[in-house]
């Protein structure tokens, strides 16, 4: 009986650790997603500002401490590519989050099952 209890305890600890790792991954995913969402909004604002400009307007790009003159068409293309990339990353993060949340639900069920089995073993030992 003691060996079975120890085995259940070990399984429970393993599952709880796995659940905690998944929860950390979910938190990290949310943090990265928040950063990408902010960048997406910033790039959309830049895109709108670039659309307002005349074709002859001077556009400068900040590279380190220096402002470098950039062609308007090139600037628009760069911003569009950046928005596409960020959008793709957001979709990827959403898909990853869905998988993590499903995995989290499965681990929670396993932990609950193991806890119930442990509770069932303990009263039996107390009566004996």
What are these regions (language model features)?
Residues 48-75, 125:
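Short coil/loop "hinge" linkers that interrupt or connect long alpha-helical coiled-coils or helical hairpins
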Residues 96-128:
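Non-transmembrane, heptad-repeat alpha-helical coiled-coil rod segments
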Residues 1-27:
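Short, charge-rich amphipathic alpha-helices with coiled-coil/heptad character
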Residues 65-93:
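Mid-chain, well-packed structural core segment of small domains
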Residues 26-33, 90-107:
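Long, charged amphipathic alpha-helices with heptad-repeat/coiled-coil character
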């Amino acid at each position: 009986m003691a060996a079975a209890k120890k085995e259940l305890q070990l399984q429970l600890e393993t599952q709880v650790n796995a659940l905690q790792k998944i929860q950390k991954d979910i938190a990290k995913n949310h943090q990265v997603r928040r950063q990408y969402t902010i960048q997406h909004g910033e790039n959309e604002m830049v895109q709108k500002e670039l659309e307002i400009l005349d074709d002859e307007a001077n556009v400068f790009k900040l590279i380190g401490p220096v402002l470098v003159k950039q062609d308007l068409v090139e600037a628009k293309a760069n911003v569009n590519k950046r928005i596409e990339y960020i959008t793709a990353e957001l979709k990827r993060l959403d898909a990853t989050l869905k998988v993590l949340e499903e995995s989290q639900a499965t681990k929670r069920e396993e932990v609950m099952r193991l806890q119930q089995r442990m509770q069932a073993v303990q009263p039996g030992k107390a009566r004996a």
